[in-house]
């Protein structure tokens, strides 16, 4: 499943009529990306399925194949409940960039509805969602996701400080994480010109992996990192 995302990468590249050399370059960039193999070295995790389905969702949206897009989106949802966050961000990008408002709205609405249902089911019949990973953004010990959102709005300075705060005083894992995640791409992600809506696609990485001080969320060898490869 880790190698399978090469298929949608090639399909997306062909949709944009990239040269064969550029297609080879993009597939190698994915294959040699530290998080691609690093996230699979710890154990078998459901996240290894997520990248393929998310990229297939993107390909279907680019091709304006609505039914295939919805099918791939549902497969991504079946992998794990927080996959809805990535789909929501993708839909937001399509909507705000005016790239495809119709499919952007479909992705956003489906992601929001699924996420609310999934949270309700997990809280009612399971052990609850793992929102304690963001306890560094709680107002008090009994906080939840609502307090995380309140912290982002009410105290953005503190939240920014948490982005560079490690799990312990003598640790530098976030610095290493930044280097390993952004280093291989050099400055490519900052060459979007005036298409600022593209930076929306970075928000899952910032919110899920950098806001928290939970060490495995920014550990390059953790399977959690596989979520970001879309």
What kind of region is each of these model predictions?
Residues 162, 174-199, 203-206:
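Hydrophobic, aromatic-rich transmembrane alpha-helices
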Residues 67-96:
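Transmembrane helices and adjacent periplasmic/lumenal helix-loop junctions
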Residues 17, 46-49, 55-68, 95-98:
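Membrane-interface transmembrane helices that cradle and orient dolichyl/undecaprenyl
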Residues 39-47:
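Short acidic/glycine- and proline-prone juxtamembrane loop motifs at membrane-interface regions
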Residues 86-113:
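Perimembrane helix-loop-helix junctions
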């Amino acid at each position: 499943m880790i190698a399978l995302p090469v298929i949608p990468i090639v399909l997306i590249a062909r949709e944009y009529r990239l040269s064969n050399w550029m297609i080879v370059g993009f597939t190698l960039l994915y294959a040699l990306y530290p998080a691609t193999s690093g996230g699979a070295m710890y154990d078998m995790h459901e996240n290894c399925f997520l990248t393929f389905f998310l990229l297939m969702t993107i390909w279907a949206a680019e091709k304006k194949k609505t039914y295939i897009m919805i099918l791939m989106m549902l497969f991504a949802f079946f992998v794990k409940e927080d996959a809805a966050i990535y789909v929501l961000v993708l839909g937001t990008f399509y909507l705000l960039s005016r790239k495809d408002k119709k499919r952007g709205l479909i992705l956003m609405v489906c992601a929001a509805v699924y996420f609310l249902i999934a949270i309700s089911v997990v809280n009612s019949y399971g052990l609850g969602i793992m929102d304690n990973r963001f306890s560094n953004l709680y107002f008090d010990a009994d906080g939840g996701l609502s307090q995380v959102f309140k912290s982002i709005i009410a105290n953005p300075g503190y939240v920014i400080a948490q982005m560079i705060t490690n799990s312990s005083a003598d640790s530098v894992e976030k610095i290493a994480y930044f280097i390993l995640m952004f280093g291989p791409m050099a400055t490519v992600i900052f060459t979007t010109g005036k298409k600022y809506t593209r930076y929306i696609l970075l928000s899952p990485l910032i919110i899920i992996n950098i806001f928290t001080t939970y060490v495995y969320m920014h550990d390059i060898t953790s399977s959690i990192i596989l979520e970001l490869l879309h």
